[in-house]
Amino acid sequence: MSRRSVGLAAVWAAFLVLAGSTLVLAEDEAKMAPEFTLPDLAGEDVTLSERLKEGPVIVDFWATWCKPCIKAFPDLQEIFDNYKDCGLSVFAISIDGPRSTSRVGALIKSKGNTFEVLLDPAQKVAKKFHVTSVPRTVLIDTEGKVAWAVTGYRPSNHEKLAEAVAALYPEGCEKKVEGEEPEAAEGTGE
């Protein structure tokens, strides 16, 4: 095989991998997210449907041994900080097994993250979401539909997720977060 053929084959393979990721994303969107209840770090149960009553939810499957997962945390924290006052929740769902679950809380604390961490050591919820690798990030709208999803971490994912979250707040949220009130319409004096 010539060098050119090898090069073209590599480009084609890369295209297929990227196209496959995009197809999986499109396939996920508009599906209903599976219901779940998981314990948080304090042992309190958190239920998806209950939280969706308050606003959209970002579900991020991760593990302590996954470096790309940890690289994504500052991006998730930034989005959470921008929208938490408008009801957005972020569930960082650890799929660490029973032997490494004890490291989850310390790692989150060391990173300064304030979003919720849930534990899925048997990976039952991860299986419901068809997680095959981490990180796996899923944005769920208030109706329980998957609005956006991606597997893996790239810096560009942050911008795409931020845009998808913003689209769920057509009236805008960031103004509310910053403490600005919408201007009242002027009366007609009647």
Where do the PLM segments sit?
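Thiol/disulfide oxidoreductase modules built on the thioredoxin-like
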Residues: 106-114, 120-166
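Boundary at the C-terminal end of the N-terminal hydrophobic targeting segment
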Residues: 24-26
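Bacterial N-terminal signal peptides
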Residues: 9-21
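Short pre-active-site segment immediately N-terminal to redox-active cysteine/selenocysteine motifs
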Residues: 55-57, 61-65, 133
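A short beta-strand-turn-helix
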Residues: 36-57
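N-terminal secretory signal peptides that target proteins for export/translocation
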Residues: 1-5
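Non-globular targeting/processing and membrane-anchoring segments
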Residues: 170-190
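Structural microenvironment flanking redox-active thiols in thiol-disulfide oxidoreductases
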Residues: 70-111, 121-128
